[in-house]
């Protein structure tokens, strides 16, 4: 799902919030003007979201094909543009700051440069800006002459007020409302071209007229409308013919209101922002604040709500695009877009099944990789615990020899032991698996010995060996963590065994 963002310097960006990647960049850098308004093209055109209107403070209106990144046409109105509304029957309405409302009917496809038409208006007095726009396109007579196309275009203008700030069309596109500095809320019928409603501000507690300064106008439906002044938000019921006062009057902020949005998804709530970064949600029924959207810094210039999904997007001077959930008011996305941002639009498309499947596959792969890494770590730990050495010392004695026991293949000392694979420590513990065996191998004849002597000699040979081995086992267990001590204790054990068996041989 794409979000269109308009920068105040003339650069326009498209960002896909599900793929989290920018998908488009077009426009030209222009620091002499700021972007005031941005809207999609005519609904009657196929793929109308591919076409976008941009209105700037220097009076330039541009019509872009954002899919092909191509500028279709532009108009110089000479005054700051406050509103752009593509109407039914190929009409285009543009409201200017000086109170001029220009309506054009385009009977041919817009494939060339647009230009203001030099046609008679319904006003008795033609505004200087309209006269200037009818003669040339641009300022200081440096741009080319206007191309007049009376055959393909019909136009009329309404000079409704001066110092116009807020402007809105009703959902039926047959009436428009506006307000501004010292201009109270007024509604005109576009077809009849007459004023149908004028609001009235209540006097304050001193019975003085409240200053009128309307910045934003927003229709809730054909019968109810919201306005945002410098410090307050008011709501009016247009069905009442006698009571022109507001039925809702809330003190929103101590700073000017920048934007107001309403959605049919939550018909009893509206959303508003001010010039210091506050974004609030209000309940129309109770006139109370429901909650706020956090993390904004600086002026929040524009708010957009998705037509079908519970998503709210904000842009402002802190150069971040933020997307919130309308239900719990939690921030879902925060994207830094480098330029100062003025306007934002949600595309109507919703996330496709392909995108959802891609996200599921990504999460599934991440889980599989995590499980694989954990299994590998467990296998490594088990292998490290299973790796052990078996060290043995074998003791043999040649009873026929009168010499001392010598080291060799026939005179070995064997002790079954276990040690870790990482070191060569000897474990002479007295566990069931650590059996100590002392073997004696007799070589040669012994005719002088008898049965009694043999029976007496056997226990005498085994007893001292076992006792000494157990003592040595205890000593070795105490010094197991020291490799040098274990090696020295093993040498001492072999020397003691040699001496003991040498004594046994002499006694025999």
From Swiss-Prot:
Feature: compositional bias, Acidic residues: 399-435, 447-456
Compositionally biased residues, Low complexity: 471-493
Region Disordered, annotated ranges: 368-508
InterPro entries (alphabetical): WD40/YVTN_repeat-like_dom_sf, WD40_repeat_dom_sf, WD40_rpt, WDR74/Nsa1
Coiled coil: none
SMART domains per record: WD40 (SM00320)
Record keywords, A-Z: Repeat, WD repeat
Repeat positions for WD: 32-74, 159-198, 252-292, 295-334
Protein's recorded name: WD repeat-containing protein DDB_G0290555
Annotated source species: Dictyostelium discoideum
């Amino acid at each position: 799902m794409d979000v269109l963002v308009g920068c105040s310097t003339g650069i326009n960006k498209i960002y896909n919030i599900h793929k989290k990647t920018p998908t488009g960049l077009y426009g030209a850098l222009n620091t002499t003007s700021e972007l005031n308004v941005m809207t999609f093209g005519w609904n009657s055109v196929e793929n109308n979201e591919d076409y976008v209107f941009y209105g700037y403070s220097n009076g330039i209106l541009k019509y872009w094909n954002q899919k092909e990144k191509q500028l279709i046409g532009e108009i110089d109105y000479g005054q700051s543009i406050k509103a752009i509304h593509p109407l039914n029957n190929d009409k285009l309405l543009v409201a200017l700051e000086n109170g001029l409302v220009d309506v054009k009917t385009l009977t041919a496809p817009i494939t060339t440069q647009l230009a203001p038409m030099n046609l008679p208006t319904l006003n008795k007095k033609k505004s200087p800006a309209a006269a200037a726009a009818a003669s040339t396109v641009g300022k200081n007579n440096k741009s080319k002459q206007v191309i007049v196309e009376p055959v393909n275009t019909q136009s009329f203008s309404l000079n409704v007020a001066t110092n116009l700030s807020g402007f809105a069309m009703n959902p039926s596109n047959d009436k428009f409302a506006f307000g501004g500095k010292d201009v109270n809320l007024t509604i005109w019928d576009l077809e009849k071209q007459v004023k149908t409603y004028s609001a009235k501000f209540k006097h304050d507690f001193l019975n003085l007229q409240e200053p009128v300064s309307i910045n934003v106008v927003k229709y809730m439906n054909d019968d109810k409308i919201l306005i945002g002044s410098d410090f307050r938000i008011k709501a009016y019921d247009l069905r009442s013919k006698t009571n022109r006062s507001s039925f809702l009057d809330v003190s929103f902020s101590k700073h000017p209101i920048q934007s107001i949005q309403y959605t049919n998804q939550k018909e009893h709530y509206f959303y508003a922002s001010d010039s210091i970064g506050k974004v609030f949600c209000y309940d129309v029924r109770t006139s109370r604040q429901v909650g706020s959207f956090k993390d904004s810094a600086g002026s929040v210039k524009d708010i957009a709500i998705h037509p079908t999904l519970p998503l709210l997007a904000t842009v402002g001077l802190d150069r971040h695009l933020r997307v919130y959930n309308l239900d719990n008011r939690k921030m879902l996305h925060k994207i830094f877009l480098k330029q100062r941002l003025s306007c934002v639009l949600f595309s109507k498309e919703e996330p496709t099944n392909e995108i959802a499947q891609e996200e599921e596959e990504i999460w599934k792969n991440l889980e599989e990789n995590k499980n694989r890494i954990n299994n590998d770590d467990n296998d490594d730990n088990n292998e490290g615990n299973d790796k052990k050495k078996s060290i043995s010392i074998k003791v043999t004695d040649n009873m026929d020899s009168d010499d001392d026991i010598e080291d060799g293949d026939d005179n070995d000392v064997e002790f079954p032991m276990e040690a870790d694979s990482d070191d060569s420590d000897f474990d002479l513990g007295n566990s069931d698996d650590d059996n100590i065996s002392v073997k004696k191998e007799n070589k040669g004849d012994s005719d002088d010995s008898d049965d009694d002597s043999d029976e007496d000699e056997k226990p005498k040979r085994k007893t001292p060996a076992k006792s000494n081995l157990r003592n040595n086992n205890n000593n070795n267990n105490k010094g197991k963590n020291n490799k040098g001590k274990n090696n020295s204790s093993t040498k001492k054990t072999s020397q003691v065994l040699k001496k003991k068996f040498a004594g046994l041989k002499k006694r025999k």
